[in-house]
Amino acid sequence: MAKLYVYDSYENRMLVYNNLNENDPMPYSYGSTLSVREFRGSSNARVLWTTTRAMEAWNLTRRRYGAGIPVGYAFKRIWEGGHGTASQHYAGVAFDVGQGTSRAIRQRIHAAATATRAWGYVEPLSMTPTWVHFDRRYGTPACSGTTSGYPTCRRGDKNTYVLILQDALNALGYTTGTLDGVFGARTETALKGVQRRFGLT
């Protein structure tokens, strides 16, 4: 059973789905084109998250492609690793698909994802020789000169990037009291504790 947070940027709210079965369709996904198990991929976490916009981008891609898209990896928690330090997989908005398919099929999936214009980034096929990567990153990266970083999280923010922050703080032993995607007082206290520990204040 999984607990799923879905950030709705249109309403700036976090929706919560408790006790989802692995074969249940992902909330906001088109029909039964993406199951919780497929979205989870190799993650062993019980708590997962994504955004309505990522699901909308998935739906547009799936409709344009017109057939099933095998999902190898989507969600990962930051402490599970397997991706770069600012991976959009940790935000629940990235998909690595098409593993085990032919080059021609991957080219069709890539073309469909690109044509939707719904993804923030569709990785060039030259960088992903045996899969297709696309993600629906959002916000402005905190570091200038890049499009791949995470946005700044501030007190009062509510989104999946706050969930990453809370997850990382909890993994380091600085408890945020909860994992809810809301940057409140306990998250701020935990963050300041880490900043002091590493001399970042």
Feature map (PLM): residue ranges:
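Surface-exposed loop/edge segments in extracytoplasmic proteins
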Residues: Y174-T176
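Amphipathic alpha-helical segments that form well-ordered structural scaffolds
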Residues: E56-L60, I164-A168, A190
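Active-site acidic/histidine clusters and adjacent loop/turn architecture
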Residues: M1-G68
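Surface-exposed patches in mature extracellular/periplasmic domains of secreted proteins
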Residues: A67-F75, W119-S126, T178-L179
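Catalytic cores and adjacent binding grooves of peptidoglycan-active enzymes
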Residues: L4-D8, T85-F95, Q99-L172, G181, ...
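Active-site-adjacent loop/helix surface patches within enzyme catalytic domains
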Residues: E56-Y90
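Short, surface-exposed alpha-helical recognition segments that flank or form part
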Residues: A45-W49, D157, T178
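Extracellular LysM carbohydrate-binding repeats and other cell-envelope/extracellular binding modules
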Residues: T187-T201
